[in-house]
Amino acid sequence: MKTIEGKVLNGFGKLVGSGIVLDDDGVLVELCPVSDDIHGWITPGLIDIHCHGGGGASFPDDPNDAGIETAIRTHQKCGTSGMLASLVSMVDPVPAIEALVPWCEKGELLGIHLEGPYISPHKCGAQNPAAVRNPDMEELRAWLEAGRGWIRTMTIAPEVENAQEAAELLLEFGAVPSWGHTSALGAQALERLRATAESGSARSFGRPAQTATHLFNAMPPLAHREPGPVREFIQAARRGECVVELVADAVHLHPDLVSDVTEYVGASPAGELGVVFVTDAMAGAGMADGDYELGGLPVTIVDGVARLTEGGAIAGGTARLSDEIKRMVTCGATTMEQAVRACVAAPAAALGIDSSACGVTIEWTVGERPSFIHFTDELDVAEVWREGETIR
């Protein structure tokens, strides 16, 4: 038997115990009753639904077993027990999709995220503009079929031609559109949000069937005469019609903004799970400063910030989700409970992932092998367990 003490939170951020007891096979035997004077935290393993890589490898640039495993392990050992593999705008993503599917099938990945290529050429960010184009339904269907049900979401600009048709096709395959990399006016974003929320396919999901890709980044800023898509995404999340991603690393977004959005959206019962923290991590996550690559574009990391070597646009993140929790909670932007909810229950709900998926623990269930993190009082990662096995 092994007892680990700490304030135990479930995936919704609710305090449910003061420690856990595991048997020799990593099976949960009991939750210790809530009590005072307990140090540290125990949370379910984190879920990252927007991650391009780490450890020197990326899913779009290294679609081979060695590269894929390196990226996965870099995040797993820091407590991300479930993750999507995010691609970028590519001329032909099929080889990368086909390389990732086996890793989904054996439970190392929760699915695949296509970030592009159906995005605004004016808001490429760190995407390759040569690969950006308007949606083609025959092409998209071929990608979805290659994904064998593992493509869970795709970033599309709401204003591009055939955006709604692409969204409907994604929903038909059980994937959700993620609006982003956009130059849309607020009215255009609202039209797409409403059309998707009211579609028959979306209604059958029983949950918000759309997300917003890294809110604020790669989209027009909130302005006093044209609020743009940012306001519409936030309001839709508060209504329970959308889920917004925040790259809560204190680089992509100021912590005060993370706090404001989390509080505003979460203040509505419909928006309780409306905010998701993501890393948008690239190959340099968990690595030293230096030169890397994202989607074939050179990237330079200086002081932990990744930027395109030419042009200087932010080119993904270098944090892991456990880093984001520490940064946001330590500076007071969120509570521990809010941060855990945004890293566990909210991402799982956004994509319809439940506790039967490998690496996913939402509630602590006696008799099951949990995936979890043991944090110190300072929110450093002390231990990581996945499916009842210690990996750190």
Roles of regions detected by a PLM:
Residues 13-31:
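N-terminal helical capping/dimerization or prosegment-like subdomains
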Residues 71-72, 94-101, 140, 144, ...:
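Generic structural signal for well-ordered alpha-helices
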Residues 114, 122-229:
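Divalent metal-binding pocket/active-site signature
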Residues 52-54, 58, 68-94, 108-120, ...:
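Divalent metal-dependent hydrolysis catalytic cores, especially in the metallo-beta-lactamase
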Residues 187-194, 199-343, 350-354, 375-379:
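Active-site-adjacent C-terminal substructures of enzyme catalytic domains
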Residues 9-18, 332-340, 349-387:
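Acidic, glycine-enriched loop/beta-strand segments at the rims
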Residues 6, 26, 39, 50, ...:
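Divalent metal-coordination and catalytic microenvironments
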